[in-house]
C-alpha cells in the first residue's frame, strides 16, 4: 500500500514541500531564515488576531484601548509586546535572508527573487500601518510625514494624499483604513510566501558554493526539519528575552504620549528597521528626489540579476566582492544610525556620503569588482 502522504491530494503538497523535498547537502544556517520568517508571520497573525479582539480603531479610544490591553486583559501585555517585538525579529530575519540572497547569488532565481522583493515592500507597508495604530505621538506624526511624501508626485500628489487620508489631515478615517489594511495584508503576505515557495521548488535551493547540487541531494526531513527546529528555538529564545526583559528597548518613548496634532515631537523618526531608508530620504534636499531615492533604495534589489557580471554565482570564492559586500553591510548600519539622529552637522554630511556609497556599491563598484575577478582567473 502506498503511503497516504504520497497519495492524498493535500498531504502530497506538504510532503513534496517539507518531507521528501530534495535539498542540497551543504546548505548552511543562512538557509534557516526562510522557515524563521514563516514562524514570525504565523506569530504575528496570531498575536495580531488576539490584539484586534480588544483594539478599537477610533482616534478617541485607540490609545486607551492599547492601555486597556496592557493593563486589564489577561496576558495582554505579553501579546502586545510579542507583536511589537515580533515585528523587529521579523525584520532582522528579513534583512539576513535578503543579505544571504545577495551574498550567495540566490537572486539568479528571477521569479523567486522578484516575489521576495514584492514581499519586502508588502511587509514594510504592513509594519508602517501597524505602527500608526496605537495612536501615540510618533504614530500620528510618523503617519503624517510618510503619507505626506506622496504629495511630491507631480499633478496628482496633493489629491492622492488627501484620498489616502480620507480628509484634510491624518484623522479617524485614516486610522480606520490603516487598521483594515493592517489586518488584511498579512494574509496577502502569506499567499505571496506560498507563491515564493512554489517558484523556489521549481528550481530547488541554491547552496553556498553557487554550483549545481543535483548530484548530491538529501531529503528535507529529517535533516533540515531538525535544523529548522534548532533555528526556531534560537529565535524564540531571542524574542522571549527581548519581550520579558526589555520590551521597550526598540520602541520610541514618544509613543507613550497620546497623539496630539498641536504638538510636534522634536525628532520624528520611524521604527529602527526603516531608519536606513529614512536616512537616504533625508540626505537629498529635494522632496521628489528624496522620495525617489527612498523607493529606489529597496527597488534596487530587483536590479540585482541584471547587475550580476561575475562568471561565478556565489561570492564564496570572490574576495574583492566579499569586501565590498561587508562594506555595504557596514554602510547600512551607518545609515540606520544616521536615520535616528537629528538633522544637523555632522550627521547631514555623513548621511549624504553613506547614501552615495550605498548606491555606488550596488550599481557601480560591485559589478566592476566582479568583472575584475573574472579577469584574475583563467576561464
From Swiss-Prot:
Membrane topology annotation: Multi-pass membrane protein
Residues where heme b b562 binds: 83, 182
Entry GO MF terms: metal ion binding; ubiquinol-cytochrome-c reductase activity
Ligand binding (a ubiquinone): 201
A Pfam entry, by short name: Cytochrom_B_C
Subcellular locations according to the entry: Mitochondrion inner membrane
Any one GO CC term of the record: mitochondrial inner membrane
Main location: mitochondrion
UniProt cross-references to PROSITE patterns, sorted A to Z: CYTB_CTER, CYTB_NTER
Cofactor entry: heme b
Subunit structure of this chain's protein: The cytochrome bc1 complex contains 11 subunits: 3 respiratory subunits (MT-CYB, CYC1 and UQCRFS1), 2 core proteins (UQCRC1 and UQCRC2) and 6 low-molecular weight proteins (UQCRH/QCR6, UQCRB/QCR7, UQCRQ/QCR8, UQCR10/QCR9, UQCR11/QCR10 and a cleavage product of UQCRFS1). This cytochrome bc1 complex then forms a dimer.
The protein's name in its UniProt record: Cytochrome b
Organism for this UniProt entry: Mogera tokudae
Amino acid at each position: 500500500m502506498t503511503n497516504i502522504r504520497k497519495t492524498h491530494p493535500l498531504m502530497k503538497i506538504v510532503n513534496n514541500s517539507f518531507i521528501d523535498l530534495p535539498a542540497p547537502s551543504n546548505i548552511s544556517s543562512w538557509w534557516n531564515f526562510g522557515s524563521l520568517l514563516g514562524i514570525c508571520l504565523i506569530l504575528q497573525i496570531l498575536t495580531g488576531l488576539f490584539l484586534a479582539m480588544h483594539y478599537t480603531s477610533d482616534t478617541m479610544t485607540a490609545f486607551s484601548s492599547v492601555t486597556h490591553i496592557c493593563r486589564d486583559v489577561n496576558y495582554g501585555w505579553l501579546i502586545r509586546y510579542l507583536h511589537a517585538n515580533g515585528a523587529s525579529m521579523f525584520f532582522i530575519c528579513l534583512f539576513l535572508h535578503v543579505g544571504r540572497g545577495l551574498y550567495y547569488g540566490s537572486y539568479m532565481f528571477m521569479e523567486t527573487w522578484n516575489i521576495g522583493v514584492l514581499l519586502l515592500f508588502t511587509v514594510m507597508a504592513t509594519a508602517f500601518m501597524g505602527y500608526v495604530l496605537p495612536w501615540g505621538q510618533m504614530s500620528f506624526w510618523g503617519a503624517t510625514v510618510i503619507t505626506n511624501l506622496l504629495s511630491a508626485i507631480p499633478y496628482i500628489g496633493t489629491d492622492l494624499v488627501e484620498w489616502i487620508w480620507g480628509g484634510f489631515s491624518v484623522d479617524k478615517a485614516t486610522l480606520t483604513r490603516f487598521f483594515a489594511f493592517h489586518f488584511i495584508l498579512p494574509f496577502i503576505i502569506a499567499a505571496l510566501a506560498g507563491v515564493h515557495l512554489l517558484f523556489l521548488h521549481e528550481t530547488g535551493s541554491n547552496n553556498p558554493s553557487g554550483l549545481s547540487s543535483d548530484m548530491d541531494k538529501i531529503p528535507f526531513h529529517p535533516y533540515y526539519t531538525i535544523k529548522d527546529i534548532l533555528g526556531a528555538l534560537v529565535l524564540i529564545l531571542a524574542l522571549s528575552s527581548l519581550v520579558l526583559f526589555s520590551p521597550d528597548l526598540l520602541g520610541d518613548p514618544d509613543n507613550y504620549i497620546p497623539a496630539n496634532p498641536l504638538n510636534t515631537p522634536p525628532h520624528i523618526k520611524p521604527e529602527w528597521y526603516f531608519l536606513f531608508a529614512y536616512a537616504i530620504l533625508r540626505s537629498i534636499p529635494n522632496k521628489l528626489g528624496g522620495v525617489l531615492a527612498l523607493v529606489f533604495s529597496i527597488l534596487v534589489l530587483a536590479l540585482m540579476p541584471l547587475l550580476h557580471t561575475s562568471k561565478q554565482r556565489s561570492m564564496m570564492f570572490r574576495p574583492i566582492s566579499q569586501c565590498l559586500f561587508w562594506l555595504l553591510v557596514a554602510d547600512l548600519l551607518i545609515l540606520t544610525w544616521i536615520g535616528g539622529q537629528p538633522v544637523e552637522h555632522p550627521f547631514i554630511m555623513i548621511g549624504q556620503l553613506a547614501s552615495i556609497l550605498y548606491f555606488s556599491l550596488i550599481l557601480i563598484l560591485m559589478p566592476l569588482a566582479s568583472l575584475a575577478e573574472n579577469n584574475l582567473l583563467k576561464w
